[in-house]
């Protein structure tokens, strides 16, 4: 899709821990397909994921580059399952802080409700519990999803509501 023909260029930052790699990849495919649908309406969505940043040494921490991209995005989407990685939490805080200052990015948190192998649970589950509590204390709405199809459906419903306003 040629984004030069689009009248609206929407930047979406996707944050999650590596445990949700499959969901991240499927979300990227979903955004690509949505672009094909939305292009006729003059909309192009650019998905920003950490995998697309170069690994070259940065003048600051590479995480600072991600945080800058978060602050310059229109929509921030974070996914959680059994842990909340420190960088994902940092990105959430940057997005939420920027939203409070400027009204952007719109912040979405999606929590996966799925089967967990008890043997795979580590102390990192506490990071998830602490983060979930933090989100609740902020009064931020979190969305539960069962699988990738459910996530895509819920996010598409949100896109249909917000894209005309962005």
Annotate each PLM feature.
Residues 1-75, 79, 101-105:
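Conserved N-terminal substructure of TIR/SEFIR domains
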Residues 1-4, 113-166:
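C-terminal interaction surface of TIR/SEFIR-family domains
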Residues 22-23, 56-57, 87, 116-122, ...:
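Switch/connector loops and helix/strand junctions flanking conserved nucleotide-binding motifs
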Residues 25-26, 60-61, 90, 123-126:
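Generic recognition of short, well-ordered alpha-helical segments
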Residues 48-52, 110, 145:
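Conserved beta-strand termini and adjacent loop/short-helix elements that scaffold enzyme active sites
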Residues 58, 82-100:
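Conserved TIR/SEFIR loop-to-helix hotspot centered on a Trp-containing motif
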Residues 63-67, 71, 89, 93, ...:
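Amphipathic, non-transmembrane alpha-helical secondary structure
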Residues 98-115:
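A short helix->loop->beta-strand "cap" motif at the edges of active sites that frequently abuts
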């Amino acid at each position: 899709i040629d984004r030069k023909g689009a009248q609206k260029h929407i930047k979406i930052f996707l944050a999650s821990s590596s445990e949700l790699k499959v969901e991240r990849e499927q979300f990227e495919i979903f955004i690509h397909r949505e672009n094909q649908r939305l292009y006729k309406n003059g909309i192009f969505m650019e998905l920003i994921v950490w995998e697309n940043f170069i690994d070259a040494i940065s003048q600051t921490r590479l995480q600072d580059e991600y945080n800058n991209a978060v602050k310059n995005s229109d929509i921030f989407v974070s996914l959680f399952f059994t842990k909340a990685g420190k960088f994902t939490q940092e990105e959430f805080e940057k997005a939420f802080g920027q939203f409070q200052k400027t009204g952007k990015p719109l912040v979405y948190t999606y929590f996966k409700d799925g089967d967990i192998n008890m043997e795979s649970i580590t102390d990192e589950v506490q990071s998830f519990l602490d983060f979930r509590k933090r989100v609740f204390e902020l009064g931020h709405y979190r969305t539960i999803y069962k699988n990738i199809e459910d996530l895509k459906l819920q996010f598409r419903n949100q896109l249909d509501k917000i894209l005309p306003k962005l």
